[in-house]
Amino acid sequence: TGVVHTAVMYGQDDFELGNQVGLPKFHLVKLDGTYVAGTDFLEERLVTDEQVAIDIIKDLAHRGLLFAKEKYEHSYPHCWRCKSKVIYYAKDSWYIAMSQLRNDMLAQNEDIHWEPEHLKEGRFGEWLREVKDWAFSRERYWGTPLPVWEAQDGDRLCVGSFEELRSLAKDPSRVGDDFDPHRPFVDAIVLVKDGKEFQRVKDVCDVWFDSGAMPFAQWHYPFENKELIDLGQAYPADFISEAIDQTR
């Protein structure tokens, strides 16, 4: 028997377990890494500050709740750029519902000849059977902008082409023939519909979304060369060669 602490919003395993047993989900830490208001002596203090941990131990001891304390060395995640300490943090994200495509992907996998053969039901097959919904949005500057615009009331527009973007733009001149559809230029395009203004959400797509779109994007599908894809002339591929890491 034993006891282990859990922090629902600050670790994947913690979050999944919390969902299973119905633990409440709320944040005690803000995006800047400091504790939220209402956390007594922790309020506005940095969660990674060593003195904060010491003060928590002192508080537990003062209230007669401390069983034991011990220092031990362990690994801890840091930002590879600035070397700052980082924490896991549950946030809202945009997902693709891959779990709804699981059965179709498994059926498609049956028609593929794999070399080596064991990957079909092994490494790749197991990944397909356990496929998770894909959190594909990223909070980065560079990347394919998520084509979603949002109004203040939460209403959203998903734009499917430059032509549609131009037709909805408050200032159509921003979407000329030579406009740059990347950040920061696309962020300045305001859309108007039903008397409401829409601002683009700041997220970009995971670069693997771009990679997955390659078979279609190289032909400018669906705006051109539709027959190559729709009639199976250029998709799916007859042969694909990948490194082992591409089989997940």
Task: Name what the model sees in each region.
Residues 24-31, 140-142, 148-151, 159-248:
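Alpha-helical recognition segments enriched in aromatics with Gly/Pro capping
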